[in-house]
Amino acid sequence: MEGLYQTQRIKDLKDKMLSEPRYASIEQALIITKTYQENEDDPKIIQRAKSLKAALEKMEIRVEPEELIVGNRTAGVRYGVVFPESGSTWVDKEFETLPTRAQDRFNVHQEDIETFRKVIKPYWEGKSLEDVLNQRYGKEINKIAKVVKINQKDHAQGHICPDCVKWLKMGPQGLLAQAEEKLKICKEEQKDFYESVKIVMEGAKHFMVRYHDLIMDMAENESDETRKQTMIKVAKNCKNISERPVQTFHEAVQSTWFLFVILQMESNASSFSPGRLDRHLEAYYEKDIKEGTLDKQQALEIIECLWLKFNEIVYMRNSHGAKYFAGFPIGFNIAIGGQDENGNDTYNDLSFLFLEAQKHLGLPQPNLSVRLHEGTSDKLLKEAVRVVAKGSGMPQFFNDKAVIPSIQELGIEEKDARDYAIVGCVELTTQGNNLGWSDSAMFNLNKALEVALTGGICLLTGEKIAPDYGNLETYETFKELEAAFKKQIDYFMDKMLLACEEVEKAHIDLLPSPFLSASIENCMENGMDVTAGGAKYNLSGIQMIQVANLADSLVAIKQLVYDEKKCTQKEMLDALKNNFEGYEILRAMCVNKVPKYGNDIDEVDKQGTKWADYFKNRLRTFKNYRKGPYHTGMYTVSAHVPMGENVGATPDGRYAKEPLADGGMSPVYGRDIKGPTAVLKSVSKLDKTLTTNGGLLNMKFLPEFFKTETGIDKFANFLRTFVDLEIPHIQFNVVRKEDLLAAKKNPEQYRGLTVRVAGYTAYFTELADELQNEIIARTSYGDI
């Protein structure tokens, strides 16, 4: 948008945020532990509510004098939170190594370690989500760990889009009043739920008023009159929204941020997402613009303050989880554009202001997404392309033509499907009515193929980890191999679903979420917590990892072993067992003589589709513990690196322990040799119902491509092709290999360099060496 600029306020706040060191924080853990101890006899949901209220009343709050949007999750910026309710055992094991571990490091205070072990750890032993699950089902989960990663074992679920519109219209006071009215008429079994909502909304109101009081105290000592008046306005916003629905754009943005801070305090989970925020805030923006109390430059500055706040919260995982979710992805996903409930193209000034904010700041959060469809305006599309060209890894793009009809197959109403949003990385959701459990588990199809080839033996350790349905030497035909592979998928899927059910049960028992539930459709109506199935929709998503390697491997076996007989079954199996040492010629054939996924070759593309379809169709026959459907996704976050470490050599020529293909729908890097359009055509052969939980296609372009208006136009047309081919998702890195190598060598000089990892953006210099190398190795395109 012409004439808009980044203010000095924003530059100063950004510099200050990025310069502060990260620490692990036990502040909330101490408050929660004490509150639990004082309320041992309460029902769990009341205990949880009182604990959140105590944290809202007692945790240290801080305000920078220049801030237009206030509210902090921790006393310091980008602190990692110790959350003992979900997991304390791993913290105890890893506290000392947090500053030195390979990925996602945090500084620690020695006195915090001592306090944790003296005060916090003893109380939570055997009571945390992590410990309870380990007692109930840990052995069974560990048995399948080389093939399946079960998630949410030591942290709350998250991955949900609350009803922001309801929150803005009611605020904590309105929801408190609603809970009080429900308490007068509810059934006995619903009382604890409504009482818990009442408690947390009282806490939310108090939290907001605390900021009002602090800022007013600060304003009294402020000598700059302009700044003083701004501070008073910010303070009044906090007080106003604690008492009534929001009335102005500034209040609406402030209220939105408080919602997400409190959600984080309640659950300490990733991927709470605002959804279609340009639409949520539109009425307040238009009103203020019309009345002359706001202009576009002022609105942009408020938005950029919100963007900075999104970057102040990071998520601290255990070292194992940090490999799978590297770079602190917290998943505040905001979607702009797309269709309205009637199928019309929709965008507004805020859509462009959000893009402008991303262009100015280039930060990893929020995870900005653009919904595209056949009727998307050229104006919005080309502006989004110009932001892509800036190289921050955003925005990513979603395809209404693929998404809307596919998620309706899950029982989602058309009006809700048209209003879909994204949570976390690429996970599809409806807004304000869906607990999607979109990160339930990851299923390593390549490891399942490995044990089908070896008779259940792990190539890396030699141990038996699966049933023996035969091995490659015993399969006289390719069909026999396929039959054994199906049996291995079935075996691990059954085990996985039993584990997922146990995880859901434990969340219901231990981590009810009354604050979140108040903003989810049907929960307040039915007096049921969202974790227990109170939402309108109750899905569970499983990720298939990774069809590119799988398709390439199966085609290699079929062609070289069974069709052309270039090698025997024993030779191929021995080559895998020996990591191709002594079998270099065979590996060269696997790599160079066999067609590869990503080049628009039906034979290999359809092999990937065939197995993804099998997995999806079988999975869809099951229901989760909340009686909702299971469905599939195809995205890896950064799991393609650690999951690759668990897989031996594969028939596509990949060496043992090397990363699998990134993304989820992306080709193996270096094998997509026919250009980006061929990649699109390959991916389009994957049925769109395979990715109702989200699909991910990564591409990397050189910055030079975007230097001219012709390049911008060509790229916009490329995205139109993406829409026509009904591919659900696409995202881009725009960066030179030389810059990435320089950043590895001199990280301090490239502190602000962000890259697209897999569905999210992270600072390149904060990624572990293995993941940096994988990103550098991805195919780069200079033209379309």
Each predicted region: which residue ranges?
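Acidic, metal/cofactor-coordinating or nucleic-acid-engaging core segments within structured domains
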Residues: 224
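Extended, structured, electrostatic nucleic-acid-contact surfaces
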Residues: 216, 220, 285
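Conserved catalytic cores of very large enzyme subunits
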Residues: 1-195, 227-233, 237, 241-784
